[in-house]
């Protein structure tokens, strides 16, 4: 999958999810559904972030246009995340994983909704 295509699938797990502060970035995006991705751990320190490890991560999968993807990617990459490709039940999708060592509190369930 290439992010140069007309539309791109993304998997989001934190502040871009429904009901979260940055979900407005996904206005007009096509919601494909929820999934759990194996091989990731969720942490929280001011912001949520996922790192590779033993665990699972709850994601929402969307199809977005190229412009939306590029806008989100610029923000995520600029704050320390890196873009990776993951497998979901909806097909391959891009996910932003944390680019450094884990810190903060681990959310063992892998679900950002547990953070209040």
From Swiss-Prot:
Assigned protein family: Belongs to the gamma-glutamylcyclotransferase family.
Pfam family, one: GGACT
Role played: Putative gamma-glutamylcyclotransferase.
Residues that bind substrate: 13-16
The keyword S-adenosyl-L-methionine is annotated on this UniProt entry: no
EC number per UniProt: 2.3.2.-
Protein name (record): Putative gamma-glutamylcyclotransferase PH0828
Positions of the catalytic residues: 76 (proton acceptor)
Keyword field contains Acyltransferase: yes
Organism phylogeny: Archaea, Methanobacteriati, Methanobacteriota, Thermococci, Thermococcales
Enzyme class: transferase
SUPFAM superfamilies (UniProt xref): Gamma-glutamyl cyclotransferase-like (SSF110857)
Cross-referenced Gene3D superfamilies: Gamma-glutamyl cyclotransferase-like (3.10.490.10)
Species assigned in the record: Pyrococcus horikoshii (strain ATCC 700860 / DSM 12428 / JCM 9974 / NBRC 100139 / OT-3)
This protein's UniProt keywords: Acyltransferase, Transferase
An annotated Gene Ontology molecular function: acyltransferase activity
């Amino acid at each position: 999958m290439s992010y140069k295509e007309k539309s791109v699938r993304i998997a989001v797990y934190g502040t871009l999810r429904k009901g979260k502060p940055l979900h407005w970035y996904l206005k007009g995006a096509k919601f494909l559904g929820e999934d759990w991705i194996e091989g990731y751990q969720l942490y929280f320190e001011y912001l949520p972030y996922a790192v590779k490890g033993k665990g699972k991560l709850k994601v929402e999968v969307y199809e977005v246009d190229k412009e939306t993807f590029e806008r989100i990617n610029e923000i995520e990459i600029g704050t320390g995340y890196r873009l990776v490709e993951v497998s979901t039940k909806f097909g391959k999708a891009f996910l932003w994983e944390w680019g450094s060592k884990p810190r903060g509190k681990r959310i063992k369930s892998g679900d950002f909704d547990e953070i209040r």
